[in-house]
Regions:
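Glycine-rich short-loop/terminal segments
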Residues: 1-78, 125-145
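Active-site-proximal C-terminal subdomain of hydrolase catalytic domains
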Residues: 79-145
Length: 145
């Protein structure tokens, strides 16, 4: 796990990113301002999984929780997921962010739709900028960890 948590990542002011090497987001993510009391975690995502270092989703919420626990700089803070659609709930299913909140026992703030980051670090959600960040709290719906 320590090898995953230390290899192929970009250190952020308060968090980390894991995008493919040639992805423009490797530059843009560095301009995003940190959010007080939140640890930023950035990579490609979907409502059910994230892509650690790749465009394809390859990591479950529980595996990412384990990576975060081993990451330098994470001291139990809340998480801001800068990963597309990780806060999007499909019907009554649990979304990625909700499962991550359950696994870590902290609040996870995640986008409801596609996340865009400008070269100046400006974030907007949804093609029409009509998305939002949603806060998921641990065991919010009474599910066991």
């Amino acid at each position: 796990m320590n090898k995953i948590a230390s290899g192929g990542i970009i250190r952020l002011e308060n968090g980390f990113a894991a995008f493919p090497e040639d992805d423009p987001l490797t530059v843009n993510i560095k301009a995003v301002k940190p959010l007080k009391t939140f640890f930023d975690v950035a990579m490609h995502g979907s409502p059910t999984a994230v892509g650690y270092g790749t465009l394809e989703t390859n990591m479950s919420p529980r595996l990412l929780a384990s990576v975060i626990r081993h990451m330098d700089g994470w001291n139990g803070q809340n998480i801001r997921l800068l990963s597309c659609s990780t806060g999007k709930q499909i019907r009554e299913e649990y979304c990625f962010a909700e499962e991550l909140a359950n696994a870590l026992g902290v609040t996870v703030k995640a986008p409801s739709d596609t996340l865009y980051i400008s070269k100046h670090g400006v974030i907007y959600i949804g093609e029409l900028r009509d998305g939002k960040f949603i806060d998921y709290h641990p065991n919010q719906r009474g599910r066991r960890k």
